[in-house]
């Protein structure tokens, strides 16, 4: 079992939670990014540097992940592909993406994309709140407990 992180856009506070959890539970954690990252020296944590380019990190993750692995991402199309491959996808806000909710999330994403293309301002995600940070940590702990 491995935790994969779409690391370029993952907030630092979420990566810090992941680092502590990986070390505490001896769980493999792989950060995939197109820029260099700093992370604790641990046999359970490593990073993969992919070429800069559209969806390079996503393709790497989906090519190397296995069923039941956890992928941390805010990227809805990546989450959908993870679910197809029998993995679990979780947002940095602690939201689990499932077969039951991913189609709705993809549709909403596509609508927002069309609005942006038409010149509408849809705004980006709000800053991560303390409650969302706690939600993420709790969801991660539940997954780790089930997976061991």
UniProtKB/Swiss-Prot annotation:
Top-level taxon of origin: Bacteria
InterPro entries hit by this protein: UPF0178
Disulfide feature: none
Record PANTHER family: UPF0178 PROTEIN YAII
HAMAP family reported for this sequence: UPF0178
Annotated family: Belongs to the UPF0178 family.
Protein name per the record: UPF0178 protein lpp0103
Organism: Legionella pneumophila (strain Paris)
